[in-house]
Amino acid sequence: MSESIERNRRHVYQGRVVSDKMDKTIVVVVDTYKNHPVYSKRTRYSKKYYAMDENNEAKVGDIVRIMETRPLSRTKRFRLVDIVKKSV
């Protein structure tokens, strides 16, 4: 029972699409904050994730939610869950 619950706990991130030039693939930038261990100042850093977009729905500038999944290629480890906000 606990093994199946542990398996389904996957990371879900929300970020901004910065590239949709590849077929069925988007690049999402996720901004997060980290506290400095000594000075306790919050610093912002970002990381890019490649995600599977099966229907090519997401466009550059959209705010999307992505979920961790099995490896789909050499770099893709996430898939598109939904589009939170469309760009103008």
From Swiss-Prot:
Any one annotated GO CC term: cytosolic small ribosomal subunit
Subunit field text: Part of the 30S ribosomal subunit.
One Pfam assignment: Ribosomal_S17
GO biological process assignments: translation
Record family assignment: Belongs to the universal ribosomal protein uS17 family.
InterPro entries noted in UniProt: NA-bd_OB-fold, Ribosomal_uS17, Ribosomal_uS17_bact/chlr, Ribosomal_uS17_CS
UniProt keyword list: Ribonucleoprotein, Ribosomal protein, RNA-binding, rRNA-binding
GO molecular function: rRNA binding; structural constituent of ribosome
Lineage summary: Bacteria, Bacillati, Bacillota, Bacilli, Lactobacillales
Name of the protein in question: Small ribosomal subunit protein uS17
Protein function: One of the primary rRNA binding proteins, it binds specifically to the 5'-end of 16S ribosomal RNA.
